[in-house]
Amino acid sequence: MSVLLETSAGDIVIDLLVDHAPKLCENFLKLCKVKYYNFSPVHSVQKNFSFQTGDPLGPLSKDSDGGSSIWGHLSGDPSERTFPAFFHPKLKHLERGTVSMATAPLQSDPDVRVAGSQFIITLGQDTDFLDGKAAIFGKVVEGFEALDKINEAIVDEKGHPLIDIRIKHTVILDDPYADPPGLREPSTSPPPTDQQLKTVRIADEAALHEDDNVDEEELERRRRNREAQAQALTLEMMGDLPFAEVKPPENVLFVCKLNPVTGDEDLELIFGRFGKILSCEVIRDQKTGDSLQYAFIEYEDKASCEAAYFKMQGVLIDDRRIHVDFSQSVSKLSDVWRKDTNSKRRTNAGRGGWGGVDELEKRRQYRDEGERVTGGNYRMVYGEEEMKGKVGRNAPKQDKDDGPPPPGPRDNGEPSRQQNRSRSPRPRDRSRDRYHKPRDDRRGDRRDRDRRDQDRNRYRDRDHRDRGREKDRYGRDENDRRSRR
């Protein structure tokens, strides 16, 4: 015994285990026979685990009662909406595609679980968590591709698909059970009710078959429209456009293929016969000033612009056949909008905040207001202890009546080593040069020079005496040698 479920994700064929769960299979078969499941939404999708369906309205509808069994549906008795579910000990949720009835504990007896119309189909292996909670009555034998699509569906935080996945039709391939009293099989599939239509998020037909039977040109046009909308939204977010749906002005013409010698006055004279021209500008290179061979002409009204468009297309100007079209540029509109926005910001700039908005305060200081005064409070290099006693730092100011301060260890005009922490080469100290010494030090230098001159004279006199003695001794020796001869 089998049932075919036609869903928006594909066809699914289910084999029923009538020998192990006869009452569950009878309930499912008869509900399919009366088209109870038609347009029922797929919900509670858990990837690689399971999904649930069988409620004609679904959990998103406030009017949903959770579904009913075939006996409660035929009689209308609320007590027959559910029936006790049977759990066969040999049937386990071990395989992908296991079909089981969703159950809930009976309010009067929590140990008894009852079923209605909703059923579960597993999307993964070893889903034994459902054992004892869902009553197995069948298994999927065909249509695993549809299970893959449902498994990959985009869902919200509650597991409801953003694009509707619904049961469109049910076909019974084999039914061994007799019809209960009052059952009438509809001749055709009934259309969805108003309550069911209210639960539609995104219609599956529009989403899944939007591009069916559409030629390539139409698909390309749709693709370009989507790209244009995305780019316009991006430009709006970046601030280049006032809004994404901005349209170019209808009173501006775009003229191209111009001769480089054609100027603004020439075009204004030629196009001026169709109406009053507000502006005529040939676009030029910013650096060289050469014409880029296209221009924009703005008319006072739309009618003049249309007349020029129909009359001037392909006209010969300065030996060039020009091309005329309606302008698609929104740069002027963007410039006007941007200038207006900036002027508002400048007007509101004095009101506080950033751009005139009080909540947007641009922070300009990185220290407390009390620390903004430069001077002794700056401690980027020295610690608090090192800053104590530094000349010109934290030392208290002396009054004029106290007299001059006592000289410090380096109060002679030389820079302090601790104050100068630069790693650059030290400049030459001209005060140590010979010719740039202070006047008070010249006397000491003169005395040193006189002392050196005296020592030099004394050494010179000693050398003269030594030479004379050697000469006398040499002369006596020579006389002795002569006398001996």
Swiss-Prot record:
Protein location: Nucleus
Metal-binding found in the keyword field: no
Lineage of source species: Eukaryota, Fungi, Dikarya, Ascomycota, Pezizomycotina
Compositionally biased spans, kind Basic and acidic residues: 426-485
UniProt protein name: Peptidyl-prolyl cis-trans isomerase-like 4
Catalysis performed (reactions): [protein]-peptidylproline (omega=180) = [protein]-peptidylproline (omega=0)
Region ranges (Disordered): 377-485
Domain RRM: from-to ranges: 251-329
Family: Belongs to the cyclophilin-type PPIase family. PPIL4 subfamily.
